């Protein structure tokens, strides 16, 4: 059950509301939504951000504030995705602390000029096994368009594509742990 939600609407008309969202079992704060500059003829895209205060199994005196970002980038043009990434980096680079950035990036890691690689480099984020097999999230051709990226100080302990059909893409799930926190040395890492 996810009692805490934050939804940002990036495109709306009489027929639909498109956007991004975050769902959590735990309350979050500092939530905001950002819609990218319009990129006609495709619908507007954007991202939402919220912070969760995480205190793994009570092992820390004070919780760690982790920022979670849910994003949806343009599906049709690499140039638009790159512009959206630059817009997003301009905002997210000003946010301090650990970050988990996830969503539908509509791009892969394989190409030399990958927008995803560019984003990871700009924000110093890491992806889970970028060349791994069996993690496709779209279609029957093995396209991996949906990703989770994490900042230094966090690490993946589990990562999987959820086989349930909930949209035209499969969801991605990860277990993320706090890495090398001095208060956690000698004990199992906290997981989120």
Where in this protein do the model-derived segments appear?
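Active-site metal-binding loops of divalent metal-dependent hydrolases
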Residues: 71-73, 103-105
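Conserved hydrophobic/aromatic beta-strand scaffold that supports enzyme active sites
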Residues: 20-22, 47-51, 70, 147-148, ...
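Short beta-strands and strand-loop turn motifs
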Residues: 32, 69-72
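The start of beta-strands in P-loop NTPase/AAA+ ATPase cores
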Residues: 65-67, 99
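Structured beta-strand-rich core segments of catalytic domains in phosphoester-bond hydrolases
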Residues: 1-65, 160-163
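A generic secondary-structure signal
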Residues: 53-58, 87-94
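Short catalytic/ligand-binding loop motif for oxyanion handling, primarily in non-cytosolic enzymes
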Residues: 15-20, 77, 108-111
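Metal-dependent phosphoester-hydrolase catalytic domains
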Residues: 35, 79, 83, 90-99, ...
């Amino acid at each position: 059950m996810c009692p805490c939600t934050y939804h940002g609407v990036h495109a709306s008309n009489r027929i639909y509301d498109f956007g991004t969202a975050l769902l959590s079992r735990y309350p979050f704060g500092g939530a905001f939504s950002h819609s990218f500059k319009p990129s006609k003829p495709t619908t507007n895209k954007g991202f939402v951000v919220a912070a969760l205060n995480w205190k793994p199994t009570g092992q820390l005196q004070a919780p760690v504030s982790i920022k979670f970002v849910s994003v949806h980038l343009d599906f049709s043009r690499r140039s638009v995705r790159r512009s959206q990434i630059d817009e997003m980096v301009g905002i997210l680079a000003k946010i301090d602390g650990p970050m988990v950035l996830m969503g539908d990036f509509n791009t892969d890691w394989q190409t030399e000029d990958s927008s995803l690689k560019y984003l990871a480099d700009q924000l110093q984020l890491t992806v889970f096994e970028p060349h791994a097999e069996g993690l496709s999230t779209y279609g029957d051709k093995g396209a991996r368009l949906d990703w989770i990226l994490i900042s230094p100080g966090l690490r993946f302990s589990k990562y999987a594509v959820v086989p349930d059909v909930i949209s035209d893409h499969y969801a991605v799930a990860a277990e993320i742990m706090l890495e090398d926190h001095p208060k956690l040395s000698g004990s199992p890492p906290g997981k989120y």
